[in-house]
């Protein structure tokens, strides 16, 4: 029972993390390639987030989880050498975001991701999911949040 519960929890986490990505076009995902060791990129991401005053509230090692559960879901290979996400928020920006439209809670937390594929070792892809909204007030604050996320990714890629 404990094993089944752990698998269900892992599946729900993956579904909640990656299914929204599948629902958006690739043009709404901003990525940059970094030719660097994954561990160096990881440290750069964590520093770039912290240097802007954000606090990571969850760090997910998605690649490890996918490898650990591969046989359980009928997979025989690995997509990633490493794949991780960092989730964080800003009380100031998030407050502005939900005050203009309460549904904008869907955009919190912010997520930066990094992965290195088995097929392209030595290149780490760093990025974030760009935000979009229907109303102008939401677009304005979401654009400000995207600017912060883009600056994190660009700093890591330098």
Enumerate the predicted regions with their spans:
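A short, structured loop/turn motif at beta-sheet edges
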Residues: 115-122
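N-terminal signal peptide c-region/cleavage motif recognized by signal peptidases
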Residues: 18-20
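Compact, glycine-rich, soluble single-domain proteins
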Residues: 61-66, 70-107
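Terminal, regulation- and interaction-focused segments at domain boundaries
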Residues: 23-63
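C-terminal partner/receptor-binding element of secreted or periplasmic proteins
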Residues: 126-158
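Bacterial N-terminal signal peptides that target proteins for export
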Residues: 1-10
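Envelope-exposed proteins and targeting segments
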Residues: 52, 82-84, 108-110, 122-124
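Solvent-exposed, acidic/flexible segments
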Residues: 34-42, 59, 76-79, 134-142, ...
